[in-house]
Amino acid sequence: MAALLYFPKISSQMTSSHFISFSPMDLRRLSRASYLFTRRLKFIAKSRKCFHTSRYLQQCVHRPDKSEETSSDRHLHERLSSVLSKRSLDYEQCKQLITVLSPLEFDRLFPEFRSKVNPKTALDFFRLASDSFSFSFSLRSYCLLIGLLLDANLLSAARVVLIRLINGNVPVLPCGLRDSRVAIADAMASLSLCFDEEIRRKMSDLLIEVYCTQFKRDGCYLALDVFPVLANKGMFPSKTTCNILLTSLVRANEFQKCCEAFDVVCKGVSPDVYLFTTAINAFCKGGKVEEAVKLFSKMEEAGVAPNVVTFNTVIDGLGMCGRYDEAFMFKEKMVERGMEPTLITYSILVKGLTRAKRIGDAYFVLKEMTKKGFPPNVIVYNNLIDSFIEAGSLNKAIEIKDLMVSKGLSLTSSTYNTLIKGYCKNGQADNAERLLKEMLSIGFNVNQGSFTSVICLLCSHLMFDSALRFVGEMLLRNMSPGGGLLTTLISGLCKHGKHSKALELWFQFLNKGFVVDTRTSNALLHGLCEAGKLDEAFRIQKEILGRGCVMDRVSYNTLISGCCGKKKLDEAFMFLDEMVKRGLKPDNYTYSILICGLFNMNKVEEAIQFWDDCKRNGMLPDVYTYSVMIDGCCKAERTEEGQEFFDEMMSKNVQPNTVVYNHLIRAYCRSGRLSMALELREDMKHKGISPNSATYTSLIKGMSIISRVEEAKLLFEEMRMEGLEPNVFHYTALIDGYGKLGQMVKVECLLREMHSKNVHPNKITYTVMIGGYARDGNVTEASRLLNEMREKGIVPDSITYKEFIYGYLKQGGVLEAFKGSDEENYAAIIEGWNKLIQ
């Protein structure tokens, strides 16, 4: 009854009994009165179904006989045929027709009068019905329209309809198939009786071509899905369209699928030279050159003559596999078939030969192509330059560049970028910088790789000003150097004292909107803390958190280490608390930094207490943390406690390393307990831990201090037998020992040996030698060494002068030192005396 509310003229003449007498078809047509009516009265469909299936009502309701329904269909058929056969669309007639039409009725009737349809009028009808009335045509109806448009040579219109259909931009009557792509192909195939073979081929051509060209990202896969559907229904696309499909697959690097599709194509059409060439290209690019050569032979056996492109494809494939002899055979075969090699042929050969480092053959081909009237173009020269760069022949690449310029060819951005890559690989920072400047001045596009390579090279050569200038050029072009390069640059700037530049660069990146990663920020924090610029480091830490950037454990460890280095333990422990609050668990390195900081402040008890607290909080001490505790105790002259930590370490099965042993050995040597030190050295050897240079330094120095110099000399020789070369500290310890014993001849021997081994004396070496000669009464040699020391830029300290004067005092007083002294000695004595009394 709700229908009567929408049709007052009908309702005035009809009663409910009339409404009940409507057939299902009448109700369906009535429901098409308007789109609004259809939506509001969805419930009628259900009630109508129930109404007409009720056994009681089936006996009461009047049903029209078949002749009435046939008459109604004939009338609708005539109206549709009349509207769609006109030269232009009658809007009013169309509107009236749509109100009484269902999609299924149109789908059933449309093929019957297709021969009378004007394709343009039908297109307008479809547009009006779908766009203005949301009329849902079936897929078959759309495909029939596409076929009619193609039959009328209205290819563009047919293409637009198909694209809108694929994109889902038109309402479509739902079909049973889940995959709409297959459904469209299936609908086209179902119209085989409606069109001749040519139109069916055009339809399949259009579908494949639209998928491949309109949907570039995954269109070839869509086309590949529908291709078997069409092929199995006998709707084979043309050879041209098949080639479009195969080419699309090659461009998508789907070489195997291309070869499989080629096999399907061969079942429906006889491949021509283009199809064969595309398949050969797929085999070559897929690394199946042998299959490509076989297909080439099969092509010739089939009577299909290869063209220049076919030969070039095979030659390129053979070249990529290093089979250049066969490639040259195919080149000769080209000539035998009456085809001259082209510029592309020669370019392929030159590029492949240079990459294979067959430079002589490459030059031979280059000369041949010039003789044949194919002067190399920019692409050929660029390939040559690139190949030489890859082969490590930078000089040859530069020669080719010069030859290119002499032939009147201009360098391209590709040429510049390739040469820059070559200069960077060879570490030629000046040339790389010059070329990059030249590129920028010309206005060429510089790729990110060139910028990055040059900036990295400049940083390694400490040319930071140039590096920063190029970073500025990158930022002007909204190019980010990347986290790795930025980290390297900031680390380099900080390492060489350019902290203000590093700070400026860091802020510049943030203000430009680029994301600065945690590793880069950590590099800046490390540089500032290492330089003692804690205020700047604290400011950066606040900026990081204020901008919502991330701080990790490394960030906090860096700040804690910086605070401990400047003896700001309160701030260090404050960062520890903040670190924990942010959910970052301190690691052993964190604890070790703080323990070391406490020891450096002579807070030994606090360090031991903190160690115990850390263990209670879950710290599992490792060799590094034990090393810090042992070193701290030993430096605080609490060697016994250091030994206790060593014993605890062994009981916990934490294996000590050379550094741990060295801490204890050095402490025992300083306190004169050589037996304990030597015992530890034997323990090291027993455990397979080799003593290092520092181990022998402590032992030799310890022996020399207590005048056991000959034993120290034996350790010195033992060290050499272990493969360790003595350094200035070992020589100095022995010289000091012999000097105190007055054995200056042995001192001189050691000094000569130092010179022969290119080991240069340091301040301590000179001091102990001066003291030895002064005590021995050799004032002249002591003065000479003092002057030599100054000449080498080593500044004497108070200990040096003390040793110098002490020798004179031992010989009879300072006044005696002046007797018989020349001007140089006199000045040295006066200066030494002044230093002592200051």
UniProtKB/Swiss-Prot annotation:
It is found in: Plastid, Chloroplast. Residues 1-32 form a transit peptide. It comes from the Eukaryota. Keywords: Chloroplast, Plastid, Repeat, Transit peptide. The keyword Transcription does not apply. GO terms for cellular component: chloroplast. PPR repeats lie at residues 238-268, 272-306, 307-341, 342-376, 377-411, 412-446, 447-481, 482-516, 517-551, 552-586, 587-621, 622-656, 657-691, 692-726, 727-761, 762-796. Its main location: plastid. PROSITE patterns: PPR (PS51375). SUPFAM superfamilies: HCP-like. PANTHER family: PENTACOTRIPEPTIDE-REPEAT REGION OF PRORP DOMAIN-CONTAINING PROTEIN, RESPIRATORY COMPLEX I CHAPERONE (CIA84), PUTATIVE (AFU_ORTHOLOGUE AFUA_2G06020)-RELATED. Belongs to the PPR family. P subfamily. This is Pentatricopeptide repeat-containing protein At4g19440, chloroplastic. It comes from Arabidopsis thaliana (Mouse-ear cress).
